[in-house]
C-alpha cells in the first residue's frame, strides 16, 4: 500500500485539513453505507473508508502513516520478530487499556454516550449602514436534523436498536496484525455497528438508519451595532443534530460588511473625503457634510490647506465594546480647475499681480485653441 491510498479512499489530498477529512469521511461513509447502498462491493468500500478515517483522523497515526505507510499507522514499537504476539495480558488487568491508549484505541470510550452535533458556518453580507446601526436578519440553510420519524434512533418505528452481536456494545474490534515491525495489536471501528455499539435490524425508512435527515432551517440573527468584517456571532444549538441523544452543534454567523460609496471605516471612526474649490479654501465657507446620521453643517476656516482633517464628534459608529459613539473625520482636498473661462483667467491673473507673484505670461490662445474650447463647451 502506498502512502496516499487512505487519502484516495476519502477523495482528499495529502495536505487536507482535519475538517476536510471529516467532511469527506461523512460524505463517503453515507455513500457506501450498507443500509443505503445495496450495490455489490459497497460494504467493502465502506470498510475501507472506515479504516482510512480511523488513521487519518488521529494526528499521531496520520504522521506515522505519512512516513511509513499502513504498517507505521498500525504500530510504533520496534521489537523482535515476535513483538507482542500471543500475549493476551492475562493477569495484568489494565494492560489492554494501557496498550490501547498507545494506539488510539480509546478503551474507555463509550460509543453510546451522547455526542454533540457538528458546528456550521454561515456568511452574512451587511450594508455599511446595517453594520453601523445593527440589524436583525433571518438566515436560511440546510442542516442535519434529528429524524422526525424515528426520533434519532435510526430504527423503524415500533422497533429498537439491539446490542451489536460482534463487538458486544463496545463499538470497536481488537485486531492482531503481522507487520514488518512484528505482531501489532490495534483497535478498529466495528464493521457491523460502525462504532455505535448498537445494531439496527430494521432501519428507519426515512433516514435509512442514520438517525438524521437533511432539513431546511431558518433562524433569526440579531446583529449588534458597530460590528465589522470577520466578526462572528455564535448561535447555540443551531448547528447539526447530535448523536445518541446529544445536543445540536452551534451555528457561527460570519459577518462581511460591504463597502460604502461615500465612507470608509476603522472601528468606530468613519472617514469622509471632501472636495472644495481653492476659493472656498482661501476665503472660508460653510458646507453640508453627509454622515450616517444625516447631513450636518461644517465650517471651513479661511486659509484651509489640502489634507486638513476636521472632526465631527459623535458622528461615527457605535463602539462595540465599552459603549459610546465614535467620530467622523473629514479630510479636505482642494480641487484645481482644469478649464478656465476668460473672466476666471483674468481674475486669477489680477489676484496673482495683487499678491506680487512673478509669473510667466501664459501663451495666448490662437484661433484653433478657441475653436477647440468652443467644441468642448457644446
From Swiss-Prot:
GO terms for molecular function: ATP binding; heat shock protein binding; unfolded protein binding; zinc ion binding. The keyword Cytoplasm applies. Zn(2+) 1 binds at residues 147, 150, 204, 207. It is found in: Cytoplasm. It comes from the Bacteria. GO terms for biological process: chaperone cofactor-dependent protein refolding; DNA replication; protein refolding; response to heat. Zn(2+) 2 binds at residues 164, 167, 190, 193. Keywords: Chaperone, Cytoplasm, DNA replication, Metal-binding, Repeat, Stress response, Zinc, Zinc-finger. Residues 5-69 form the J domain. A zinc finger (CR-type) spans 134-216. Pfam families: DnaJ, DnaJ_C, DnaJ_CXXCXGXG. CDD domains: DnaJ, DnaJ_C, DnaJ_zf. CXXCXGXG motif repeats lie at residues 147-154, 164-171, 190-197, 204-211. InterPro entries: DnaJ, DnaJ_C, DnaJ_domain, DnaJ_domain_CS, HSP40/DnaJ_pept-bd, HSP_DnaJ_Cys-rich_dom, HSP_DnaJ_Cys-rich_dom_sf, J_dom_sf. One of its GO terms (cellular component) is cytoplasm. Participates actively in the response to hyperosmotic and heat shock by preventing the aggregation of stress-denatured proteins and by disaggregating proteins, also in an autonomous, DnaK-independent fashion. Unfolded proteins bind initially to DnaJ; upon interaction with the DnaJ-bound protein, DnaK hydrolyzes its bound ATP, resulting in the formation of a stable complex. GrpE releases ADP from DnaK; ATP binding to DnaK triggers the release of the substrate protein, thus completing the reaction cycle. Homodimer. NCBIfam families: DnaJ_bact, PRK10767.1, PRK14276.1. HAMAP family: DnaJ. The J domain is necessary and sufficient to stimulate DnaK ATPase activity. Zinc center 1 plays an important role in the autonomous, DnaK-independent chaperone activity of DnaJ. Zinc center 2 is essential for interaction with DnaK and for DnaJ activity. Belongs to the DnaJ family. This is Chaperone protein DnaJ. It comes from Streptococcus pyogenes serotype M1.
Amino acid at each position: 500500500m502506498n502512502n496516499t491510498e487512505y487519502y484516495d479512499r476519502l477523495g482528499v489530498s495529502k495536505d487536507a485539513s482535519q475538517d476536510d477529512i471529516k467532511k469527506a469521511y461523512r460524505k463517503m461513509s453515507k455513500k457506501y453505507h450498507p443500509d443505503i447502498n445495496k450495490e455489490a462491493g459497497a460494504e467493502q468500500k465502506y470498510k475501507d473508508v472506515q479504516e482510512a478515517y480511523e488513521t487519518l483522523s488521529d494526528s499521531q497515526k496520520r504522521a506515522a502513516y505519512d512516513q511509513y505507510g499502513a504498517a507505521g499507522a498500525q504500530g510504533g514499537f520496534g521489537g523482535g520478530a515476535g513483538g507482542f504476539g500471543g500475549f493476551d495480558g492475562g493477569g495484568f488487568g489494565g494492560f489492554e487499556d494501557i496498550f490501547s491508549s498507545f494506539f488510539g484505541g480509546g478503551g474507555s470510550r463509550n460509543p453510546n454516550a451522547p455526542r454533540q452535533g457538528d458546528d456550521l458556518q454561515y456568511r452574512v453580507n451587511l450594508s455599511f449602514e446595517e453594520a453601523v446601526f445593527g440589524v436583525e436578519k433571518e438566515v436560511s440553510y440546510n442542516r442535519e436534523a434529528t429524524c422526525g420519524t424515528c426520533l434519532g434512533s435510526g430504527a423503524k418505528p415500533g422497533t429498537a436498536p439491539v446490542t451489536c452481536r460482534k463487538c458486544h456494545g463496545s463499538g470497536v474490534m481488537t485486531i492482531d496484525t503481522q507487520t514488518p515491525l512484528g505482531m501489532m495489536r490495534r483497535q478498529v471501528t466495528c464493521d457491523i455497528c460502525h462504532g455505535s455499539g448498537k445494531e439496527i435490524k430494521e432501519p428507519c425508512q426515512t433516514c435509512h438508519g442514520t438517525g438524521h435527515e437533511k432539513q431546511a432551517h431558518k433562524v433569526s440573527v440579531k446583529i449588534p451595532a458597530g460590528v465589522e468584517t470577520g466578526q462572528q456571532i455564535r448561535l447555540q444549538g443551531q448547528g447539526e443534530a447530535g448523536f445518541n441523544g446529544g445536543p445540536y452543534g452551534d451555528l457561527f454567523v460570519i459577518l462581511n460588511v460591504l463597502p460604502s460609496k461615500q465612507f470608509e471605516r476603522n472601528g468606530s471612526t468613519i472617514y469622509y473625503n471632501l472636495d472644495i474649490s481653492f476659493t472656498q479654501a482661501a476665503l472660508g465657507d460653510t458646507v453640508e457634510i453627509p454622515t450616517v446620521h444625516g447631513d450636518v453643517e461644517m465650517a471651513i476656516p479661511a486659509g484651509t490647506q489640502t489634507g486638513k482633517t476636521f472632526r465631527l464628534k459623535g458622528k461615527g459608529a457605535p463602539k462595540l465594546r465599552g459603549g459610546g459613539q465614535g467620530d467622523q473625520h473629514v479630510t479636505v482636498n482642494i480641487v484645481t480647475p482644469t478649464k478656465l473661462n476668460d473672466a476666471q483667467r483674468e481674475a486669477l491673473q489680477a489676484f496673482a499681480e495683487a499678491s506680487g507673484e512673478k509669473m510667466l505670461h501664459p501663451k495666448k490662445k490662437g484661433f484653433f485653441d478657441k475653436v477647440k474650447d468652443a467644441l468642448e463647451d457644446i
